[in-house]
Amino acid sequence: MLKILQPTQQGESVAAKNANTEPSFRLASTDSDLPAIVRLAQKAHKESRFGYIPFNADKVLKIARAAFKDQKRHAVMIAERCGQAVGFVYRSVGEYHIGSDVLLTTIHNMNGSRTIRSSLSGGKIALGLFRGVKTWSKARGAKEILFHVTSDVNLAQTHKLAKRIGYKFVGGSYVKTA
């Protein structure tokens, strides 16, 4: 595809400038991805309703490394903007726990950094992560994608986006102190 470059007053091209600011998405697959995954998970954890629970970076590392080893069933996708990791999604595919012969994808964790969520790029990041999940799920033959939201962060905004991109509301999560 031919791109027409429009010079700016400084002589740089708009396409080159946008290439640095547009989000990119990739599957995480090596230990070099781990610091960004842990950093994003820790920030999201602190902000969420689960922030009172001590964060365990070793558990994040264990989950990510297990996903790296079994990429047919698990994956971590990282969203980057300007060379910095600004979001990620961890998902897996498998059978319904009391069913057989049908694969379902479960989004276990989807996070975007707080600063990116409040910008125009936040929507692009979220949509890119959802598209990545859909593509990955189709490649594995999943029939449905389950998206569970339990963070208690931006619930109305998350609900609106999920509905807009085709997710059907099928229930809710409830919590009570034991």
Predicted regions located by residue number:
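A conserved beta-turn-beta hairpin within the catalytic core of GNAT-like acetyltransferases
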Residues: 95-107, 168-170
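Acyl-donor binding region in acyl/amide transferases
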Residues: 102-163
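A short helix-loop-beta-strand connector motif used in the catalytic cores of GNAT acetyltransferases and
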Residues: 65-78
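A short beta-loop-alpha structural element at the N-terminal edge
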Residues: 22-39
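Flexible, glycine- and charge-enriched loops at secondary-structure boundaries
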Residues: 30, 53-57, 119-123
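Conserved beta-strand in the GNAT
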Residues: 78, 84-93
